[in-house]
């Protein structure tokens, strides 16, 4: 499968996406389903299409994605990051535009750990004065 495909790995929170692109008609398949079916919300589809719209390749590539882990938004972000890396693998001249838009940088925000003696990461137990 790797023959004439360009590859990119994308990550966001706990989601990991493996993205393969090749010249084609613009079909995007995520985990064996069309992108419209996999991402039910419009925001998820919009996030996935951003790097393609920016570079003007919305209907130039067939894209196969395998994504796992995390939730819907994290997976959409991981797919966007993977598509960006695959586009750079295809044509390095696209990197400045994608970098300017902030798609190349991996979003490093992760869930903060729960601390001992707290209810959540920062939420303390209720204080009773008396």
From Swiss-Prot:
Q: Which SUPFAM superfamilies match?
A: Ribosomal protein S5 domain 2-like
Report the GO molecular function annotations.
RNA binding; structural constituent of ribosome
> A GO biological process this protein is involved in?
translation
Top-rank taxon: Bacteria
A Pfam family it matches: Ribosomal_S9
* Keyword tags: Ribonucleoprotein, Ribosomal protein
Q: What family does the database annotate?
A: Belongs to the universal ribosomal protein uS9 family.
Q: Which HAMAP family match?
A: Ribosomal_uS9_B
List the protein's name.
Small ribosomal subunit protein uS9
């Amino acid at each position: 499968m790797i023959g004439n495909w360009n590859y990119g790995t994308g990550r966001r929170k706990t989601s990991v996406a493996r993205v393969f692109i090749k010249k084609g008609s613009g079909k995007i398949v995520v985990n064996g389903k069309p992108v419209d079916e996999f991402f039910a919300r419009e925001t998820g589809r919009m996030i996935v299409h951003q790097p393609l719209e920016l570079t003007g390749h919305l209907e130039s590539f067939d894209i196969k994605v395998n994504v796992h882990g995390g939730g819907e938004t994290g997976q959409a972000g991981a797919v966007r990051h993977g598509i960006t890396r695959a586009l750079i693998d295809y044509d390095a001249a696209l990197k400045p535009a994608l970098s300017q838009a902030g798609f190349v940088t991996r979003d490093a925000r992760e869930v903060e750990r729960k601390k001992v003696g707290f209810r959540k990461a920062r939420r303390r137990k209720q204080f009773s004065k008396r």
